[in-house]
Regions:
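Alpha-helical bilayer-embedded segments of polytopic membrane proteins, i.e.
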Residues: 82-128, 155-159, 212-227, 243-293
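C-terminal, active-site-flanking charged/polar segments
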Residues: 282-295, 299-300, 361-370
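Short, charged cytosolic
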Residues: 49-73, 219-229
Length: 400
């Protein structure tokens, strides 16, 4: 895919008509400004791999009309309609299971068997987070107010994550996925996502970057705690309008209610050592499950420089990775396995994404747009290879 400003097509050459091979496993995803050609491990079920080299660059107007045509086709299929029946059952069943978990916690009492309860509640916290995610994208109800109410209850009150903070961050991600310096999900932090981020590290931070592929899954055990802390810190940010400050105050009340209720319940039922172990297992597995659900979506996919101009359709498709699976995969990953369809139509209800997949995949094949789908384990392997390659400049035994 050529790094021309908006087309992402390869320059003409004697070999331009041949399908490009995937990049070597050790090569990290790079921005379009770092290299001329970005290759991906494309897997098109039922079609041949798209060959961007054989497609002439569309004009800006035609690119816009491509997404408009896809949007019309999806809308005519009825897949953007709300699914109140599905979400009534989904939300109700999730609340019952969450309540059952806490009831079991109270009934079991002082016992190391509570670590199994902690594992169950970690699963339910993540599933509750998926519902908060759906509400944040206005997938559940036609009313924005109802969606936000559901989102705040599920995120702030039930699992202790700041709904407002997450929505602001997640909207920036959806606007420019995998854009360096624009997508907060690839901002420099514990993990380096670009070699430029890795090169400036020193000391313990550099050691972390050198070994980040090996440490990735262990670090996810801290993701739940990191999300809690980030949400609480956002509550103390005084920036914003009067309305946003009022909203923050209400969120702060819900978060405080969750935190106080959680700690009181755990330390009231369990002795101190068991209570600490329960919290460690519960929050650790919650972070691991949440992180493993979101990690395959974009990590290791093509990345754009801040000022790269890419039309909406390609911006969302080329940076996203779908996970091949079945209905259990849909449940376990909260519909995030249809990441391409979700990014193209964020407000599409979760159960409709699997039906939209064939429409989107066929459309992409027809227009020569690379559509990336792989298995879950393969996606983790791709993510780890990318993280290992990004940390390459920090390993002195290699030459850069």
């Amino acid at each position: 895919m050529q790094a021309r400003a908006a087309g992402l097509h390869c320059a003409a050459s004697p070999r331009a008509s041949r399908t490009r091979r995937p990049a070597p496993a050790s090569e990290p995803a790079r921005t379009l400004s770092e290299r001329q050609t970005v290759t991906t491990d494309i897997m098109n079920r039922g079609t041949e791999p798209a060959d961007p080299a054989g497609i002439s660059e569309p004009s800006p107007g035609s690119r816009g009309s491509e997404y408009a045509a896809l949007s019309r086709e999806v809308k005519q299929s009825g897949l953007l309609k709300r699914r109140p029946g599905y979400y009534s059952v989904k939300v109700g069943a999730n609340l019952l299971l969450l309540a059952a978990g806490w009831t079991a916690f109270a009934l079991i009492g002082d016992s190391w068997w509570q670590l199994l309860t902690a594992a169950f509640l970690a699963v339910m916290f993540t599933q509750t987070g998926f519902i908060g995610h759906d509400a944040g994208h206005h997938q559940i109800a036609a009313s924005k107010r109802v969606n936000n109410l559901l989102g705040r209850v599920h995120a702030d009150l039930l699992i202790g994550l700041s709904y407002g903070w997450w929505i602001a961050k997640h909207n920036r991600h959806h606007s420019h996925p995998n854009y360096v310096d624009r997508d907060p999900d690839i901002a420099d932090g514990a993990i380096a996502f670009t070699q430029d981020q890795a090169r400036v590290r020193s000391g313990a931070y550099a050691w972390l970057g050198r070994h980040q592929a090996w440490l990735f899954f262990p670090m996810l055990l801290l993701e739940g705690l990191a999300l809690h802390v980030a949400g609480v810190r956002a509550m103390f940010d005084r920036a914003g309008t009067r309305t946003s400050r009022v909203t923050k105050l209400s969120e702060a009340g819900l978060l405080t209610g969750h935190l106080v209720g959680y700690l009181v319940a755990v330390f009231l039922v369990l002795p101190p050592v068991q209570a600490v172990c329960f919290i460690a297992v519960h929050q650790g597995l919650f972070g691991l499950y949440m992180g493993c659900s979101f990690a395959p979506n974009h990590k290791g996919m093509p990345m754009f420089a801040k000022d790269d101009k890419v039309d909406f359709l390609r911006r969302q498709v080329l940076t996203s990775r779908n996970i091949r699976g079945h209905r259990f995969t849909d449940f376990a990953l909260g519909g995030l396995n249809y990441q391409i369809e979700h990014h193209l139509f964020p407000s599409m209800p979760r159960p409709s994404l699997r039906h939209a997949q064939e429409i989107v995949r066929t459309f992409c094949a027809r227009h020569g747009i690379a559509y990336h789908e792989t298995g879950l384990l393969s996606s983790y392997a791709q993510v780890l290879r990318h993280l290992h390659a990004v940390g390459g400049p920090l390993r002195p035994e290699l030459e850069y």
